[in-house]
Amino acid sequence: MNTIKILIGLLGIFLFSLSGIVSAQSDATTQLSQLLSNFRTYQAKFNQITFDGQDRVIQQSHGRVMIMRPGRFRWETDSPTKQIIITNGKTLWVYDVDLSQATQQPLAQKTNINPASLLSGSVKDLKQKFTITISPTPDAATFQLVPHLGKSLNFNWIRLKFSKKQLTEMTVLNNLDERSIFQFSQIKVNAPLSSTLFEFKPSRGIDVVKQ
């Protein structure tokens, strides 16, 4: 599965503020909104493993992720190839280090849905975009999000696992029945991050492709 497609499809969940939520309900949507609104920045290392429909491993990778809300995201893959995905909320850069090539394009054009509008910040909007259920345990909570817009988001469902109010695992099933599991470790929430981490200025010699 193409990791870029997964990440772009999910950007709206993490990048855009969910502040200002007021609800007397204690349903899955409200609980997820409250958890996501707890952080301004998020840093972690990740390990990814992807299985095909027959549960065969087809991809593994590891690296780090950095998020600053609203709108900024940096995903660095160290292995099997070095790749950096950066957005400041407006422009998306995908830099393939080994190829010395960077792709630049407006973020909204990467998917049929503008990530900025995916979650606009209210329980009502979450319910309009997704069917959300929760599977709680004594020390964790796992939310499943099924998009109402189906294939236009490149995935069938997402599962977000929170332990001690921190996002520790994300599982995605795509339209090809491929399942990717992202496990996060060394998590830092609301630690200072420089805004320069979310800007990309190609060095001389890097081939830039605009889309």
Swiss-Prot record:
Cysteines joined through disulfide linkages: none
Assembly information from the UniProt record: Monomer.
UniProt family annotation: Belongs to the LolA family.
UniProt-listed Gene3D superfamilies: Lipoprotein localisation LolA/LolB/LppX
Location of this chain's protein in the cell: Periplasm
Keywords: Chaperone, Periplasm, Protein transport, Signal, Transport
Name used for this protein in its record: Outer-membrane lipoprotein carrier protein
Cellular component terms (Gene Ontology): outer membrane-bounded periplasmic space
NCBIfam families: lolA
InterPro entries in alphabetical order: LolA/LolB/LppX, OM_lipoprot_carrier_LolA-like, OM_lipoprot_carrier_LolA_Pbac
Pfam families, sorted: LolA (PF03548)
Keyword Membrane: no
